[in-house]
Amino acid sequence: MKIRSLFSIMALSFGVSSVQAINYSPDNVSAELLLKVPGNDAVHHSLKFEKIQNSEYDYQLVGNKKLPLMLYQNIEGSDNCKRITMLVVALEDVYFNYGQLVKTASRHDDCLFYMPGFWYRRNLRSPKEAPSFHTSDSWIVREDRLSTPLTAIYDEKSGKSFSVVRIDEFDSDALTTHKEGEVILSGKTSIGYTGFENKDGISALSFGYPYREAPKTYISKLTLAPSVEAYQFLKKGESITLTWEVSERNVNDFSECVKQIWEYSYDLYKPEPVNTPYSDEKMKEVLSNFFVESYVDDTPTKYYSGVELRTATCENLDVAEVGFVGRTLLNAFNALEYGESQNRKDLVDNANSIFDSYLQNGFSSRGFFNEVVHFKRNFVETNLSIRRQSEGVYAVLYYLNYEKQHGRKHPEWEKRLKTMLDAFLKLQNPDGSFPRKFKDDFSLVDKSGGSTPSATLPLVMGYKYFKDKRYLEAAKRSVGYLEKELISKADYFSSTLDANCEDKEASLYASTAAYYLALATKGQERAHYAELAKKAAYFALSWYYTWDVPFAKGQMLGDIGLKTRGWGNVSVENNHIDVFIFDFADVLHWLSKEFNEPRFTAFSEVISSSMRQLLPHEGHLCGITKKGFYPEVVQHTNWDYGKNGKGYYNDIFAPGWVVASLWELLSPGRAENFLK
């Protein structure tokens, strides 16, 4: 068994500059070897670095007594970027776990921490049931939790950041019989661990192979379990080569730390588009079956059943949801536009029935959308959200604009939307934010402003459609809030509604909101909003995978060949990947042109190609019962939303928003065309 480095051993220094060199010396680096005999507790061995001569390696790592492994380490690179190569050779059959620690010289209390797609700052926006400083100030996690297998430590006082990234082929994983404690792997894994530790008040980068997780392992939604250590078997005479890169940078703030690390990660991994057989036209043809089989017409408001479905049956349920995970109205617009272009009368008729029925029966007494309705229980959700309301208005504005272009007018819909947009003006706080949740009478349920950017989009669109400058001014105030409280503080949180934590959608929505305002303004204003869109975009991009997570044999996603590059982690609380993208691909293309940044367009192509892979159709249903019902909760690491674990989906899913997201990805230029 031999794991080779993905890249040749060479000095790399992407985006690295510093006055001081990394102190990668035996005095500042510690290493340990854990050895396990099945049926016995593991034994820990502290290792010493002994300089060796006339060898391709710089050091041999030795213990206080003879070990069943020979360990060699080579260090290459510049002062600020060190490539560390480990050779592990088995002298006898052995089960082992290797770990290393590099101190940074920064006080732990002065530092913020970054593990892409999983850890931002100190994760203090997350509940104590998820990984955060609420539980511990030191965390190590398995690499497949992260969109890049990397940890960075940012010292706010010195302006320095330190990072470690793993470099490998990542071609295998292995099952275990237990999820906690000392576990022996059933085969070969490529997955190691990475993280940060507080060592006597000093921050340290921690990394090793195979994986460990401490002080807890995050195994399910809001479920922390005891720590885990995995042990890799090496047969006598076999060897493994392991490679990491440790870097140091000067940065101005946490935002620049994330930006530089994303550029560095992209340049290091060089993700390429995934080769799939699905053109835009084929994708839409298959996805359109969702509009057919999910349509429900025996209720006061017609809708597409896209919430709380079971993957095993995909049978329609009684839940209608305007936005968020249902996205009924956006799907109705997509079905109408596609149906007319393809002469699909069934799609057109159903879509029009949805809009007509919502106009008649889809509103509360105060003029807000009935955003979630359970018909069999005769239950209407009374806690309203700015996100669902905004996404409903957004969809109807696209519908009205499309209808107007085709000579069809809907004055009652226009009246309804103006009432709603005026209500948004009333809801908006003096600081420009919008409450996350509220009642029909405008009383507040959740006053936090994390969902504010979702309101910016329909306000900008409403300004353009109704030519009412009040909506544009409200949109500007909302982005003023985003700039002050989210973007400048690098604190993106609570955009999604099924979790309250650091999440991808907050930064994605913030970037998109600034993009919409840039499209609607000119001169210095436009340039300012473009800069904000770019700054937030790096945080959004940090959630998307630059690498392909390995799966074990027998894990369905691996067996069907899923490549994870281009898929996005969801949030700290929900540690799975999904296809949430909507028109963010357009944002990336636009930013690429505005700032001459080819990485944005190139990675957008990776996202677009990769998110086609699990298209369910005859002979390739990917674990979903019905054609076109694209999967939602894609579990790529040792975590689940409630069922099934790595390599599978949760048993409950919401294809409604998934189809809507992919459809917008496949319909480029919508916002620019609407706002021009």
How would you name each of these model-derived features?
Residues S25-I52, L234, N252-E321, S353, ...:
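Low-complexity, Ser/Thr/Pro/Gly-enriched N-terminal "stalk/linker" regions
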Residues L329-K345, E391-K409, S454-D468, Y509-E525, ...:
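Well-ordered alpha-helical scaffold segments within catalytic/enzyme domains
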Residues C257-E293, N343-N361, Q405-L425, K467-K484, ...:
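Extended, well-ordered alpha-helical scaffold segments
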Residues S288-A320, Q360-E381, F424-L444, E483-C501, ...:
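Glycine- and aromatic-rich loop/turn segments at beta-sheet edges
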Residues I3-G15:
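Sec-dependent N-terminal signal peptides
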Residues Y24, P38-N40, D58-N64, M70-K236:
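Beta-strand/loop-rich accessory regions of lumenal/periplasmic or secreted enzymes
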Residues N378-V380, Y398-K469, K484, Y538-Y544:
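Active-site lining segments of carbohydrate-active enzymes
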Residues Y231-S255:
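Short Pro-Gly-centered flexible turn/kink motifs
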